[in-house]
Curated annotation (Swiss-Prot):
Gene that produces this protein: rlmG
Family as reported in the entry's similarity comment: Belongs to the methyltransferase superfamily. RlmG family.
Pfam family, one: MTS
Protein name in the entry: Ribosomal RNA large subunit methyltransferase G
SUPFAM superfamilies: S-adenosyl-L-methionine-dependent methyltransferases
Taxonomic source organism: Pseudomonas putida (strain ATCC 47054 / DSM 6125 / CFBP 8728 / NCIMB 11950 / KT2440)
Enzyme Commission number(s) of this protein: 2.1.1.174
Length: 374
């Protein structure tokens, strides 16, 4: 893989999760453009820089030890990538503090480097949080590949920060620079909430939660077919989102024990709040994690999963395949993985390569619900 070479550093970077022979690199031209732009401004060593949504640590690791850097984002895998890439390049583990998106950072900051996220609600929430956290004369510089840069990103920066200047395109990347100006303090519209009829739940969704404004159709197809009569089973909701699968299952299985896992900090925050609202003080475990990688082998009886088919803007089934592998490792012999998936993704054949028995529980014109037994 090529090295990231910028005015600040030459770094050997890897993506997360790691894949053998991964053809994708851990940085792009937007990262290079952001770092070059910052360097051209010649900030001194005391400059406080906040890095937002740094996919695999390219920005923060480049600035580590040179400026006063704080990184924040909603991806646990992004956090893990930053830690691994710091170590991989001989940089101190604690040279870049990381603040999960479920928590608030402490300014003032002189510069903010932003990778424009896929979910504009997350960008809006972050820009609102920046109000009152920026030093006089501060700039917010957002970068993206042009094909992933919506016009609305600049509109949001103008609304919450100040006047925006768009750069020329460079290697198919573009920057938007907002200079701090007087703006009325905004009240965040997040989290949002929607009502589910069966089971009757009011579900809280923080800004970066998948299908924040309503139940996704895959989960809607899955809910009527969740397993019952689980007794004291140990159940994991893998990729839990707002926690609706685990909560619905827990309501039908009062003795079962639940672990809710997602790589999004805001998803886990939403799941925890929704569990508390629906089930009170009933114990459960909530993890922002790399799937089930940290769980002991053969520690679960049931895994529920509505697997994603994209990581940021990259589409594919590699995350789902990895989740299936993790579920197999974590399940006891005889344990079962229940999933929902689009028919065209062919999950049945993939599961058959890992599990001794795969059966179709139900189907709609678009989705299948499958049970795979170890």
């Amino acid at each position: 893989m090529p090295l990231l070479t910028t005015p600040y550093a030459e770094l050997d970077l890897i993506r997360q999760p790691e894949q053998a022979n991964d053809p994708l690199q851990a940085f792009d031209a937007a990262d290079e453009y952001l770092l070059a732009q910052l360097h051209d401004q010649a900030p001194d060593a005391n400059c406080r820089v906040l890095v937002l949504n740094d996919s695999f640590g390219a920005l923060a690791a480049s600035l580590a030890g040179q400026l006063q850097v704080v990184s924040s984002g909603d991806s646990h895998l992004g956090h893990l990538a930053l830690e691994k890439n710091l170590a991989r390049n001989g940089l101190p583990f604690d040279s870049v503090p990381f603040v999960p998106a479920s928590e608030h950072w402490q300014g003032p900051f002189d510069r903010v480097l932003v990778r424009v996220p896929k979910t504009l609600a997350l960008l809006e929430e972050q820009l609102i949080r920046l109000q009152g956290q920026l030093a006089p004369g501060a700039q917010v510089i957002a970068g993206a590949m042009i094909k992933h840069l919506p016009r609305a990103a600049g509109d949001l920066m103008e609304k919450y920060i100040g006047p925006v200047q768009a750069s020329l395109a460079l290697k198919k990347a573009r920057l938007l620079t907002a200079t701090v100006a007087e703006r009325p303090l905004a009240k965040s519209p997040y989290p949002s909430c929607y009502r589910l009829d069966a089971p009757a739940l009011d579900l809280v969704n923080h800004a970066n939660v998948f299908c924040r404004e309503g139940l996704d159709i895959g989960t809607r197809a899955f809910l009527p077919h969740l397993p019952r009569n689980l007794g004291r089973a140990r159940v994991a909701d893998l990729g839990c989102g707002n926690g609706v699968l685990a909560i619905a299952s827990a309501l039908a299985n009062p003795e079962a024990e639940y672990t809710l896992v997602d790589e999004s900090y805001m998803a886990v925050q939403s799941a925890q709040e929704n569990w508390l609202a629906a089930l009170g003080e009933r114990p459960a475990t909530f993890l922002a994690a790399d799937g089930l990688a940290g769980l002991e082998k053969q520690s679960l009886d049931v895994v529920l999963c509505n697997p994603p088919f994209h990581q940021q803007q990259v589409v594919g089934d590699f995350l789902a395949w990895r989740m299936f592998q993790q579920a197999r490792e974590a399940l006891v012999v005889g344990g079962a993985l229940y999933i929902v998936g689009n028919r065209h993704l062919g999950y049945h054949s993939k599961l058959a390569r890992l599990f001794r028995g795969v059966e179709q529980v139900a189907a709609t014109p678009k989705f299948v619900i499958l049970k795979a037994r170890k």
